Amino acid sequence: MAAELARGDLMATIERQRFDLIVIGAGINGAGIARDGAMRGLRVLLLDKDDIAAGTTAFSTRLIHGGLRYLEYAEFGLVRESLRERERLLRIAPHLVSPHRFLIPIYAGARRSPALIRLGMVAYDLLSFDKSLPWHQMLSPEETHALEPGLDDGGLCGAAAYTDGQVTFPERLTVENA
């Protein structure tokens, strides 16, 4: 009963105010949009049917990535924007977002050839020219196996190693943005 009264009081307060921006959904994206609007001087209302970061954000991969897979579809603008946002999060939330190294094994006869993987890695590095993270590395089969001894050696040509970001607690990052 008390919660219903509090909700009623809250709704009455909201109805008496004017907002420049109403964001529906208090996950990581909604909170980020609300933060951006508030930083631009807008009067922002952030709404959600549940708790902050209780939906998709809570069950995400926790990756703060630049969209490497979008290079395959020539979405260069999207990749560049994602890389800028990754860099921004690494800078403003180092207590929550940290570098994470990835390895892409390359096998003979795979859909993506070693040359295509290398081209993608170079493009990813060039689109993130202002990054604080290390550039990619192309590894030999021996170097790859030393890093990941569990990989199948059959047809292993090597690997591409690159760094993206990972958020430890996406819910906390969301709350800090809200």
Task: Please annotate each region the language model reported.
Residues M1-L21, D36-R40:
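Extreme N-terminal leader/targeting segments of oxidoreductases
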Residues I22-I24, L45:
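Conserved hydrophobic packing residues within short motifs/helices of P-loop NTPase cores
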Residues A26-G27, K49:
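Glycine-rich Rossmann-fold phosphate-binding loop(s) that bind the pyrophosphate
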Residues G30:
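N-terminal Rossmann-fold NAD(P) dinucleotide-binding loop
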Residues A38-F59:
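Glycine-rich FAD pyrophosphate-binding loop
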Residues R62-L147:
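Dinucleotide-binding Rossmann-like beta1-alpha1 core, especially the glycine-rich loop
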Residues D125-W135, H145-A178:
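Helix-loop-beta segment of a Rossmann-like dinucleotide-binding subdomain
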